[in-house]
Amino acid sequence: MKLRPLQDRILVKRIEEEQVTAGGIFIPDTAKEKPQRGEIVAVGNGKKTEDGKVIPIDLKVGDKVLFGKYAGTDIKVEGEDFLIMREDDILGVIE
């Protein structure tokens, strides 16, 4: 199944954080916070204005992005976990 977000929504796959610190300390799952980084896997066409024009999304598939801790909605597609969020939820692009 392929999922295509609508309007200004973006489908993001979380990038998991390291499980071991630089000092070699293992971080158990119970002590980890949700990652706030991800890779864009699909984007919508853009936001529609009141007069019907479409404002295209500035992001593209493959961009690595930062987003807020509580941004987006968790979804599962074919057994994989993703976030679907609006373009406004993206804080920045990692270059």
From Swiss-Prot:
One of its GO terms (biological process) is chaperone cofactor-dependent protein refolding. Heptamer of 7 subunits arranged in a ring. Interacts with the chaperonin GroEL. InterPro entries: Chaperonin_GroES, Chaperonin_GroES_sf, Chaprnonin_Cpn10_CS, GroES-like_sf. Keywords: Chaperone, Cytoplasm. It is found in: Cytoplasm. It holds the Pfam family Cpn10. NCBIfam families: PRK00364.1-2, PRK00364.1-5, PRK00364.2-2, PRK00364.2-4, PRK00364.2-5. GO terms for molecular function: ATP binding; metal ion binding; protein folding chaperone; protein-folding chaperone binding; unfolded protein binding. Together with the chaperonin GroEL, plays an essential role in assisting protein folding. The GroEL-GroES system forms a nano-cage that allows encapsulation of the non-native substrate proteins and provides a physical environment optimized to promote and accelerate protein folding. GroES binds to the apical surface of the GroEL ring, thereby capping the opening of the GroEL channel. SUPFAM superfamilies: GroES-like. The keyword Chaperone applies. It comes from the Bacteria. Belongs to the GroES chaperonin family. This is Co-chaperonin GroES. GO terms for cellular component: cytoplasm.
